[in-house]
Amino acid sequence: MAEEVNGIINVYKEAGYTSHDVVAKLRGILHQKKIGHTGTLDPAATGVLPVCCGKATKVCELLTDKEKSYRAVCKLGVITDTQDTTGTVLQTKDISGVTQDELSDTIQSFVGDIMQIPPMYSAIKVGGRKLYELAREGKEIERKPRPVTIYAIDIKDIDLENGSFTMDVTCSKGTYIRTLCHDIGEKLGVGAAMDQLLRTKVLIFEVDQALTLAQIEERIQQEDRSFVLPVDQLFTQYPKMQVADEEAAKMLRNGNPITIGKLKSFNEVKKYQNKSRVLVYNENGEFRAIYELRGNYYRVVKMF
């Protein structure tokens, strides 16, 4: 039996797959169950979906919380029940009065901390049921606005002749890009719906390095695992430390606190953004844990 894959795979999610579909197919390709994704992408959306395998599933929540980047194509003058063009058209409006400057200013007005009302067609649960399940039954319930942050919007193209615009968006966890498109259209007074969505980046994972499921399967058949990112490479902001003796090695194996003098530097000297947290390696140089300095002891944050 092949050795278990431990690390993060930068999957290119193709249109038509749910995030759960990707995980299910990867379980078949890798022949292992311990796999988890790091944040849902709509079935119609494409792009970066980091998938954690084996021991790396312990960092899933750390990746889910990070900012993400997208490229979205939005259609002006149309309002749908799903806030994207896959939904039922509820209303169409004339956009002939919209100018390029007005559209550009409206788009940029959403940069910063904003409040978003989640769409009915979303996986948010209310009373134990997902909103999209209620929406499919023709029900609409009140949703509370949620705070999200739009860090940047770069307008890539405005095509008023065809009633569309393309933008690159960097945003916080929990941001709905189709809701952003909808809200831009609403503020303009003409409506808008998202037409295409590509997730371009999550942390260090970029779309041009992402692999499709077919490409991953081919690599695995060739016994090539070079595309699997080891967990410690996610945390380059933390210094690397190695156990200094057998006593420290035993402490590490058990996840016990380790005194400062029992860890030695594993790195070339350089400045780190965060010195209180360290990556700890065993006597064989294998990454085993993230520890945090509290007083005179390093205490475990996460074991791997």
What would you call each of these model-derived segments?
Residues M1-S172, D183-L211:
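Catalytic cores of RNA-modifying enzymes
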Residues M1-E14, H20-H37, L41, A45, ...:
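Accessory RNA 3′-end/elbow-binding domains used by RNA modification enzymes
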